[in-house]
Design a protein with these regions (language model features):
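Conserved short submotifs of the Hanks-type protein kinase catalytic core
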Residues: 84-98, 102
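Protein kinase glycine-rich loop
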Residues: 15-21, 26
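Flexible N-lobe loop architecture of eukaryotic-like protein kinase catalytic domains
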Residues: 19, 61, 70-73
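Glycine-rich ATP phosphate-binding loop
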Residues: 28, 36-45
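Activation segment signature within eukaryotic-like protein kinase domains
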Residues: 117-118
């Protein structure tokens, strides 16, 4: 597990943990060469866990597919770093709050705002569905939508 101050691949300095899921952790990091912030997803390899092999293979397939995408509302993947015990996926850092967080703090939102969010989500899904082959996003939920 990376900690604050850890340098990844000689250039990405971990600033803080910004997210945690079932299969990964996400850190905010600074590229020391470009003076730019990135989000770095850390996926741990667990040699003793057969299920982890599936998780790692799935995460790598997802990262390799996503690095080919180019759409303003989707984070770009700019680097994939494979180490013996861990994989780091370096992607755009998107500032803001999740839809889940906004709804928890503020409750229901004005109809006009929700319609704009829905339109943008539809545009993103349309972009994904028009890829060859089509990409089906199966993890659409408020916690995965940044505003």
């Amino acid at each position: 597990m990376a900690e604050r101050g850890t340098i990844i691949e000689g250039k990405y300095e971990v600033l803080k943990l910004i997210g945690k899921g079932g299969m990964s952790k996400v850190y905010l990091a600074m590229d020391k060469n470009l003076n730019k912030q990135w989000a770095i997803k850390e996926i741990e390899r667990k040699a003793y866990d057969k299920n982890n092999e599936v998780v790692v293979a799935s995460a790598m397939a997802e990262a390799n597919m996503m690095k080919k995408l180019d759409y303003p509302s989707l984070p770009r993947i700019v680097d994939i770093i494979e180490k013996e015990n861990v994989i780091y996926v370096v992607m755009d850092y998107i500032e803001g709050e999740t839809l889940s967080s906004v709804l928890s703090k503020e409750g229901a939102q004005p109809q006009e705002v929700v319609i704009e969010w829905a339109k943008e989500l539809c545009r993103v899904l349309d972009y994904l569905h028009t890829q060859n082959p089509p990409i089906i996003y199966r993890d659409m939920k408020p916690a995965n939508i940044m505003l």
